[in-house]
């Protein structure tokens, strides 16, 4: 990815993301982002819409599942990624080339909405500690202790498990 040009697109999803799985089991979500530029016409004192760009986009693996479970048709999103061209042959035998956005980062725009973010457990056991018998331990509490940005439950807010106060002195 070093040296590759990334672009950012802000627009609305035209449909719910389509989640599929490859034969090897990798998740992929495909969707279209519609982005319409708006300019202010001083003569008419009104906003004018430009031509809408419909950009196909794809996202892979765990992020694909997160996108499919979080974003829906009409959601205003901010997506950043790399443009990739792909050639294919239609059923009629015609050769086609399309340009798609290979998404690196995506999220809802908070300009006209609000969102609650729920952190997911990462696959590959990066955040999960195992007990002696090989079964997962209390991953949520372990991850919270290891993560300085984790939110304490209200009952524990302001104090550590060792009884010392975590509130700053000011």
From Swiss-Prot:
Domain SSB: 1-110
Region (Disordered): 113-170
Matches recorded under SUPFAM superfamilies: Nucleic acid-binding proteins
A Pfam family the protein falls into: SSB
Annotated keywords: DNA-binding, Plasmid
GO biological process entries: DNA replication
Transmembrane segments: none
Top-level division of the source organism's lineage: Bacteria
CDD domains (UniProt xref): SSB_OBF
Molecular functions (GO terms): single-stranded DNA binding
Listed GO CC annotations: nucleoid
UniProt-listed Gene3D superfamilies: Nucleic acid-binding proteins
Ranges of compositional bias, category Polar residues: 117-129
NCBIfam families assigned to the protein according to its UniProt record, in alphabetical order: PRK07772.1, ssb
PANTHER family per UniProt: SINGLE-STRANDED DNA-BINDING PROTEIN (PTHR10302:SF27)
Complexes and interactors: Homotetramer.
Record's protein name: Single-stranded DNA-binding protein
Organism, as annotated: Paenarthrobacter nicotinovorans
GN (gene name): ssb
């Amino acid at each position: 990815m070093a040296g590759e040009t990334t672009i950012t697109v802000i627009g609305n999803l035209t449909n719910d993301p389509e989640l599929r799985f490859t034969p090897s089991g990798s998740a992929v979500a495909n969707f279209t982002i519609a982005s319409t530029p708006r300019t202010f016409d001083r003569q008419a004192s009104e906003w004018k819409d430009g031509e809408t760009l419909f950009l196909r986009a794809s996202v892979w693996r765990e992020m694909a599942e997160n996108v499919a479970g979080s974003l829906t048709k009409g959601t205003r999103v901010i997506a950043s990624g790399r443009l990739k061209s792909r050639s294919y042959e239609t059923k009629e035998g015609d050769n086609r080339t399309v340009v798609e956005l290979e998404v690196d980062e995506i999220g809802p725009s908070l300009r006209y909405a609000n969102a609650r973010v729920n952190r997911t457990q990462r696959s590959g056991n990066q955040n999960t500690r195992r007990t002696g018998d090989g079964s997962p331990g209390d991953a949520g509490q372990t991850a919270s202790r290891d993560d300085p940005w984790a939110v304490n439950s209200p009952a524990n807010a302001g104090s550590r498990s060792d009884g010392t106060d975590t509130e700053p002195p000011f």
